[in-house]
Amino acid sequence: MKQDNTIGSIKLDLPDVSNTPHTPRPRTWSVGAALGAIGYGYVVVMIGFLYLPILVMALMSANASPLYELPFHFTTHWYQALAEDGVLKAAAFRSIEIALWTTLLSTVLGVMASLAFFRYDFAGKRFLQAMLFPPMAIPWLITGTAMLIFFFAIGIGRGLHAILLGHVALALPYVIIVVGARLRTFSPELELAARSLGASGWQITWRVTLPAIAPGVVAGALFAFAVSFDQFVVSYFLSDPGETTLPVEIYSAIRKGFTPEINAISTIIIVVSMGTMLIVSRLYRFGGEQ
């Protein structure tokens, strides 16, 4: 392509560079790019450190060899053996029962407390809200010891009732915080509008408030179930011999000798827990879109 090198009446003698091949600049590594690569590698290593043991455990739960030998041969024998293990089955059903009762009680109490914090101003409100966080930060070893001493002091002692009360105490702050976070996105004008149309307080709660915060309530309930079902330390302190939960029974079985059935039940627990967290995440996203 011919270039026009004329400016007015002056003709410039410029080289034709239209067909000159482009020479790419040599790529150099900057400090920012190097730090980004290091950070990316660190994230990959940490994800592998967290999830590789879980992956190995899941694979070994379906390996035919009871001694964790390779090569890998797929089998469902250990899951079938798990279904025939009366002790683990009883502990699993006991954990599910306690988790369901914990979910019901902590959700009802948590929603009531969240609505009270949302609707009313009273003396000590800020203090009570601040006291929701220490139970989640205090080591469960300390919490379990304190609960054991307290329940013996008031005559409850150990057993399923003590485990249930302990789990409700642990799960309740999660429900209040999750439901409270959802209530902060709720418009109080909706309740005022319903009241101006003649709705009673009960009708406002059931027909206006609860449907609007339903994703937060379900998310809090799932959190409560996960906290109860996976809880080991408090259950270990408060359980009676013969009436243990599944995490405690798994710990006892490992002390006697590690078997592939433990891999199988642990894999099931991890799948249930991860599924619960995915549902909670989806509910939060759905609530935000609404």
Give residue ranges: language-model regions:
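C-terminal transmembrane helix and the adjacent membrane-cytosol boundary/short C-terminal tail
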Residues: 2-22, 26-29, 38-39, 124, ...
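Interhelical loop and adjacent transmembrane-helix boundary motif
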Residues: 8, 15-18, 27-35, 79-87, ...
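Membrane-interfacial helix termini and adjacent extracytoplasmic/periplasmic loops
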Residues: 22-29, 67-69, 76, 124-125, ...
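Transmembrane-helix boundary motif in ABC transporter permease subunits
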Residues: 27-31, 100-132, 145, 149, ...
